[in-house]
Amino acid sequence: MSCPVIELTQQLIRRPSLSPYDAGCQALLIERLQAIGFTVERMDFADTQNFWAWRGQGETLAFAGHTDVVPPGDADRWINPPFEPTIRDGMLFGRGAADMKGSLAAMVVAAERFVAQHPNHTGRLAFLITSDEEASAHNGTVKVVEALMARNERLDYCLVGEPSSIEVVGDVVKNGRRGSLTCNLTIHGVQGHVAYPHLADNPVHRAAPFLNELVAIEWDQGNEFFPATSMQIANIQAGTGSNNVIPGELFVQFNFRFSTELTDEMIKAQVLALLEKHQLRYTVDWWLSGQPFLTARGKLVDAVVNAVEHYNEIKPQLLTTGGTSDGRFIARMGAQVVELGPVNATIHKINECVNAADLQLLARMYQRIMEQLVA
């Protein structure tokens, strides 16, 4: 199958860019963008490679994505080696095919076609690419955004190429994401012998009523755009492994995926009040991974919906479900942010794959979005 989108996707898959290492992917993208007149600024931080590229001036539409991938797992369980792209029955297999090297290829090819047809486009077309999205995300998009904001860089619209679709390309478009807040909580007791409980203080017993009340809380009911806030306990650890020792500490880690009905400070206050109510001795550490954001109907959402309807003849759902994405950082710039990418059924799995025809379709959608916003 000869198609510039498929060929570029295959070239990217062959580069084993395990997060946060880029493995030469960005050099390939930069070469293609510079060839059509983009100015490229590398913005590397620690072991992470990033670049910001732009062409033209004025109202700015950026395409954002990541070159890094998650580990492939047991390579013997793949139908072909994970970094050797293979097409079978119209499906392109390889780590990163759907998340998100296919999107990157579609973006670049769309830009090439757009520039060829609109060499003097009236707005500015940009790319924000990182190699640190799948791992810590500490030195990736967030650092680039901070640098761009420090110099008052303009960003009006941003399309993130995350695999948003469920069954066919464009059936779901993400126009926002929930916030993510993690609590690392240690309940302190007194270690002792299980035969002498009066000489100890069991933190597991102490914490049980608190945890029961915590999991029963209805945090909110969501709203028109967001599902209700959810809280899930992810890890609990206590004890020495011995059956005759009362533990001295209990560690509990729980995560909130929260809507715009709450702030992280509201959640923290409610948890701390509950700890005090149960008279627990504790230490607590919070990690805010991202605030919730929402892009209401406007020029970007309308352009994306138009592109999907034009090429796939379906009306996309606008959803905010799922995990976090780098869109949470880009939204800080005041930009309208939307995610549109391929079907996500196999992301992070053994035998990750994407319909090759979907990538060709995605490139056409991306080009139509460019034409509506910056031509």
From Swiss-Prot:
Binding positions for Zn(2+) 2 per the UniProt entry: 99, 134, 348
Record-listed E.C. numbers: 3.5.1.18
Cofactor(s) needed for function: Zn(2+); Co(2+)
Residues involved in Zn(2+) 1 binding: 66, 99, 162
PROSITE patterns given in the database record: ARGE_DAPE_CPG2_1, ARGE_DAPE_CPG2_2
UniProt-listed GO biological process terms: diaminopimelate biosynthetic process; L-arginine biosynthetic process; lysine biosynthetic process via diaminopimelate
Enzyme class, UniProt record, top EC level: hydrolase
GO molecular function: acetylornithine deacetylase activity; cobalt ion binding; succinyl-diaminopimelate desuccinylase activity; zinc ion binding
Superkingdom of the source species: Bacteria
Keyword list, A-Z: Amino-acid biosynthesis, Cobalt, Diaminopimelate biosynthesis, Hydrolase, Lysine biosynthesis, Metal-binding, Zinc
Manner of cofactor binding, per the entry note: Binds 2 Zn(2+) or Co(2+) ions per subunit.
The keyword Amino-acid biosynthesis belongs to this UniProt entry's keyword annotation: yes
Pathway field: Amino-acid biosynthesis; L-lysine biosynthesis via DAP pathway; LL-2,6-diaminopimelate from (S)-tetrahydrodipicolinate (succinylase route): step 3/3
Family stated for the protein in its record: Belongs to the peptidase M20A family. DapE subfamily.
Assembly with partners or alone: Homodimer.
Protein name: Succinyl-diaminopimelate desuccinylase
Organism from which the protein derives: Shigella flexneri serotype 5b (strain 8401)
